[in-house]
């Protein structure tokens, strides 16, 4: 009687339409139920309804009121959490193939089929790439996936690398090379092989793309008036045609990927590590910048760019050069007087330039780099905190001044290029930055002066931003630096000259690593076009966008692999509840995120372990500080002692408690 009754259908539709509808994102839990988070509130999703959705799905749901509680009934899929994803192979009790999504908040197994292109015989725990084919809300069928790619076996010790690269859709292989390479540049090169160029790199570096030669500038009375520096940079574009496959692959990769233990080069290894590498006593094609400074490190006159042949006379290592300059006992010594002279002069020049940048630009605060020392099987033997020593600073200062010269040379002669830019504070956060500085630095005496000094208008200028950074530099601790960092915008690649607030410079364009960075290859081609009086083609928006995207991807790959390796390294140490000094990186409602100073690992400290009553914990998002009963206990930049209590390799997370 009631079947196909139009009145009943109409009544049902009216009842449905009368219910409020919301859009939101599904939040899974480790129980069968979940939640729908909307902009304004959070709704309960009952276990039967959770079977139709997955953590992270963006959905439309009807809101039903049951008793005095509201709950969401999922109705429509707006955007699935999963499309392409990383998973582990699983076989259920009936030996049916399933996949377990590699995500900390998704724990339901998904039925799967193997694509015909995947030839491997899959075993429990193998790593794969899968795509979601059906979704209950969209297709009226259960979740179902197709395995599209085999990554590695469950036993592969290098899974952290291969899985992470697959997740971010990056190749684990170098770019394919050519059978032969020939010199494509027809211009005459100046012979600079007599100059005593030296390279300073890590001991094991093969892709050496910069060599340095320096001499003092003297007046007729033999008094020194400045420095003359030649920066020779490897010239891969001399061998790579613009329409070649190597160029296309480099444009896609954008950077050499430096991973714990090894790198994946942007160019074929026979170019990056051999033909273009500025190897000791080998004549190499190079693009050279010759520049002069006065005794204070100020650039004098116009820098000169030339195509040249150079020959590195010494392959030097950072630690050896630093030991020698710091007069460490039994330190390495230069092989001959010419090399010794170059090291000493480069040292003097670097100190002058550091001083110049301190006054006229901005210096980065010293923070260590953490490097993983691996055994052949990929196991982490140790993690070293490496500080930049004087030899690193020599190379850094030489590269920075060369990149400043490149920016202004391209702006003047090519009217375009790939420029590294940074505009400081995000416009929308300028008032926040002003208020924060006033709250932390002003008092009754200086309030009027600082209100002007740190006005929104002044903070938006390069000079005003640099002045503010110089003001806070002597202040003890990292709190101001860390908090202000959250108000900054991201660095960007642009095709016109623009300031780089982070460096405190009016212009910056890198060209000193063409073996490792595609942007530097582009700038090489533009410098060469200027030298040959050819047309300079503006880099496309697509190239700039790809550089931005690739830089972000590479950082995520490096971070994800490191998180995994930290878990492996600390897994067998957690039983002894080791204690570490750590720096607070973030304060959240759920707890603190801290970084271990000894090895750089990121550890989460749950709020429940800090204070038993969560209602008495408040987080001040303006200060990025955690309060207990109205009293500020922790803020970003604080140094705390923590005890490591848990290592979860499956989610790549470390848990600790405050001591």
Curated annotation (Swiss-Prot):
Protein localization: Cytoplasm
Catalytic activity line of the entry: Exonucleolytic cleavage in the 3'- to 5'-direction to yield nucleoside 5'-phosphates
Protein's recorded name: Exoribonuclease 2
Alphabetical list of PROSITE patterns matching this protein: RIBONUCLEASE_II, S1
Keywords per UniProt: Cytoplasm, Exonuclease, Hydrolase, Nuclease, RNA-binding
Pfam families cross-referenced by the UniProt entry: OB_RNB, RNB, S1
Family: Belongs to the RNR ribonuclease family. RNase II subfamily.
Cellular compartments per GO CC: cytosol
EC category: hydrolase
Gene Ontology terms, MF aspect: exoribonuclease II activity; RNA binding
Disulfides per UniProt: none
Domain (RNB) ranges: 189-532
Functional description taken from the UniProt entry: Involved in mRNA degradation. Hydrolyzes single-stranded polyribonucleotides processively in the 3' to 5' direction.
Organism of derivation: Mannheimia succiniciproducens (strain KCTC 0769BP / MBEL55E)
EC number: 3.1.13.1
Signal peptide, first to last residue: none
Keyword Magnesium part of the UniProt annotation: no
Gene3D superfamilies, A to Z: 2.40.50.640, Nucleic acid-binding proteins
One BP annotation, GO: mRNA catabolic process
S1 motif domain segment(s): 577-659
């Amino acid at each position: 009687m009631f079947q196909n009754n139009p009145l009943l259908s109409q009544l049902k539709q009216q009842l449905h339409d009368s219910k409020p509808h919301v859009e939101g994102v599904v939040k899974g839990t480790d129980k069968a139920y979940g939640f729908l988070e909307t902009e304004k509130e959070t709704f309960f999703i009952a276990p039967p309804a959770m079977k139709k959705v997955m953590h992270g799905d963006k959905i439309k749901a009807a809101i039903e009121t049951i008793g005095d509680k509201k709950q969401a009934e999922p109705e429509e899929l707006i955007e699935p959490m999963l499309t392409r994803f990383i998973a582990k192979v699983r076989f259920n009790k009936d030996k049916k193939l399933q996949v377990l999504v590699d995500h900390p908040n998704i724990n339901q197994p998904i039925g799967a089929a193997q694509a015909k292109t995947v030839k491997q015989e899959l075993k429990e725990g193998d790593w794969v790439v899968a795509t979601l084919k059906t979704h209950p809300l969209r297709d009226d069928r259960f979740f179902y996936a197709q395995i599209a790619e085999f990554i590695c076996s469950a036993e592969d010790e290098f899974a952290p690398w291969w899985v992470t690269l697959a997740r971010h859709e990056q190749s684990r292989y170098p770019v394919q090379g050519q059978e032969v390479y020939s010199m494509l540049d027809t211009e005459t090169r100046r012979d600079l092989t007599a100059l005593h160029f030296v390279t300073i790199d890590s001991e094991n570096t093969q892709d050496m793309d910069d060599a340095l030669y320096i001499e003092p500038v003297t007046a007729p009375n033999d008094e020194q008036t400045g420095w003359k520096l030649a920066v020779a940079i490897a010239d891969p574009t001399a061998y790579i045609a613009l329409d070649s496959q190597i160029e296309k692959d480099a444009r896609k990769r954008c950077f050499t990927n430096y991973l714990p233990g090894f790198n994946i080069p942007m160019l074929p290894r026979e170019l990056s590590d051999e033909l273009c590498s500025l190897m000791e006593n080998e004549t190499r094609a190079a693009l050279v910048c010759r520049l002069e400074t006065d005794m204070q490190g100020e650039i004098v006159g116009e820098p000169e760019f030339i195509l040249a042949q150079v020959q590195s006379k010494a392959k030097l290592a950072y630690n050896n050069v630093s030991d020698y300059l710091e007069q460490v006992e039994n330190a390495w010594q230069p092989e001959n007087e010419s090399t010794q002279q170059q090291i000493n002069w480069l040292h003097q020049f670097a100190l002058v330039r550091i001083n110049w940048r301190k006054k006229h630009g901005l210096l980065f605060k010293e923070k260590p780099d953490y490097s993983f020392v691996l055994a052949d099987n990929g196991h982490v033997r140790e993690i070293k905190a490496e500080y930049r020593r004087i030899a690193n600073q020599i190379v850094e200062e030489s590269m920075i001044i060369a990149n400043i010269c490149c920016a202004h040379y391209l702006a003047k002669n090519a009217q375009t290029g790939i420029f590294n830019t940074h505009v400081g504070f995000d416009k929308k956060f300028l008032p926040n930055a002003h208020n924060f500085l006033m709250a932390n630095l002003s008092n009754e005496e200086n309030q009027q002066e600082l209100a002007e000094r740190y006005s929104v208008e002044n903070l938006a200028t390069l000079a005003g931003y640099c002045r503010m950074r110089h003001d806070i530099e002597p202040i003890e601790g990292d709190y101001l630096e860390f908090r202000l960092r959250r108000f900054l915008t991201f660095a960007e690649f642009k095709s016109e000259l623009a300031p780089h607030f982070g460096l405190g410079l009016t212009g910056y364009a890198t060209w000193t690593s063409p073996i490792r960075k595609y942007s530097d290859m582009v700038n090489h081609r533009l410098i060469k076009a200027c030298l040959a009086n050819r047309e300079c083609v503006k880099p496309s928006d697509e190239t700039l966008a790809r550089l931005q995207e690739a830089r972000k991807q590479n950082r995520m790959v490096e971070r994800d692999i490191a998180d995994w390796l930290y878990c492996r390294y600390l897994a067998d140490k957690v039983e002894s509840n080791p204690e570490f000094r750590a720096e607070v990186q973030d304060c959240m409602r759920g707890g603190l995120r801290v970084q271990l100073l000894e090895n750089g690992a990121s550890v989460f400290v749950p709020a429940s372990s800090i204070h038993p009553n969560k209602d008495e914990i408040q987080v001040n998002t303006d200060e990025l500080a955690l309060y207990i009963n109205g009293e500020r206990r922790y803020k970003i930049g604080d140094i705390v002692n923590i005890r490591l209590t848990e290592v979860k390799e499956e989610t790549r997370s470390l848990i600790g408690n405050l001591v």
